[in-house]
Amino acid sequence: VACNPHRVGFLGLLVTLGIVFGDIGTSPLYVMKAILHTGETISESTILGALSCIIWTLTLQTTIKYVCVALRADNNGEGGILALYALLRKMKRKWIYILAIIGASTLLADGIITPAITVTTAIEGLESISPHLPVIPITLAIITIIFFVQRFGTESIGKSFGVFMLIWFLLLGVTGAFSITSYPLILKAFNPYYAAMLLARSPEWFLILGAVFLCTTGAEALYSDLGHCGRKNIAISWGFVKTMLILNYLGQGAWVLNHADTALAVNPFFAIMPQSMLFFAIIMATGAAIVASQALISGTFSILSEAMNLHFWPRMRIKHPTHVKGQLYIPMINLAMYIGVVLIILLFRDSSHMEAAYGLAITITMLMTTLLLGFYLHSKGVARIFTMLFMGAYCTIEAIFLTANLSKFLAGGWCTMLIGGILFLMMYVWVRAMKIRRHYISTKPLNDYYQIISDIKADESIPKYASNLVYVNHASKEGTVDDKLLYSIINKQPKRADHYWLINMEFVDTPDTLEYSCETLIPDTLYSVTMHIGFRIEPRVSLYLRQVVEDLVASRKVDLKSTYPSLRKNGIPGDFRFIIIHRVYYPERSDNRQQNLLMSIYAIISKIGIDEPKALGLDTSMVVVERVPLIISQRTGSIRRIARIEE
């Protein structure tokens, strides 16, 4: 369901609850349980210290960093680490893209573990009712349904997410507040003194912080979903959500101190529920886990869609299952995520083991966001002292959390780091390979060929290839053209047409830009159309060109009626044919081993993408693909004639 990011009202706040807070809203299911399993002795000082860490982590990380600072670093209303990078990519620091792809890779890796841990923890609540219920099969069944329905879109059920999450957060707050009454001294946890004392005296402080960090793993989603809901809706909703979360954490802490002897045997989240409400709480927890999973899956699709337009990821088939703006479905990614989540569940078996795999990857994402935010603040002329204080404080905090989470590496953190590492390698190779490809594309000044193109059009001895011939021009410099494009028109097979169209695509730093400019290079013959496409917009060239042509015809800047008398008599327009110059990389030995390795990996990665006509949204019945070799070897040589010996 859509949310107007520019308006604040009850409906907008309700929708925001359903879209933004699923991940962070399910953290109470496992955070306290994870803290109890660090091995630290259960005592008042331990629980007060841990709760104080939770409260101040939510305050420093989520409230101050994300709500107060990051939400203001928007790219025309859009947020997220890639939207932030798009604002900065014109900076002189060319290496800054590495921060963006590290952050995006680890964020995507986190999206694999979140559905697994949230759904598993919710279903484990059934063990308190019936200890012999098969948790894993039920969890796998729910996960299968979640991923299966993605192809149909979630517009119909999405409308209820906001109402559901409102009930969920009220359940968290009310049950937590009721439990607090049994141990009112738990409110001392608001004093950061207890957090400092716990971390100072406990030899297991890094394990405790690793568990505490799980309370804020969903904070990055607040920033990523900025474009869906708007800063004010998120900020106001967060005030309510944070209150409910803290009440629940305090309630769980109160229960633990009242039941210190048995606390390790059960999940405190379900333990604070009245027995009569336990089954209802399990149903609600399962529903909240589904909402959180849905948000992560949708977020993954959005991130990869942005990555494609930023040339971080190969083009893949994207579907739009509903009419809701921004709702995407990428079949191959959906399948890959499903397989990944299932393997995580089968590998770790229960939520306690999954907790070890959770948190490490997202810590790195947050650290990368902090660094990019620092560059953003500097680019906006924010006082240097404030920028340095912000970066220093949050780099220190997140480095401490990273150190704490590294302690979980062997116990399970390796899993998300492996996934994140593979994704980073793919993105890094793709970026470098695209730069290499552009480097070896030879271009020529277009105006040197105006006369010969005009002559080809006028030469009736050449069979007409099409009425309108369209090329995608990959030359980056204005006024130049890909030499293989000229070779296609002039040398390979002279192509006579009534009109030649050169399409230049410029992916801009703003998210939703969709504009064009058209220049007539040869009157009534050659046109150059530049499409300015935002990083959230799909490059559907056929559709956009049709709109461009309709505009030009309506303004009488071009006459596209067929030149065939019988067709022109009936007002039928000329046909269009697209020519795609596809460069195929052929591995060759060269002295640059690093470049050879990059291009070899690139050739493998490119197999998961779709071909260029589909990537550009072209009608394949109107497309001719001309393949040419991409030669990156610097070696040159000449063939030597062998002397012929006459007998």
What role is predicted for each listed range?
Residues V1-E647:
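The structured alpha-helical core of multi-pass membrane proteins
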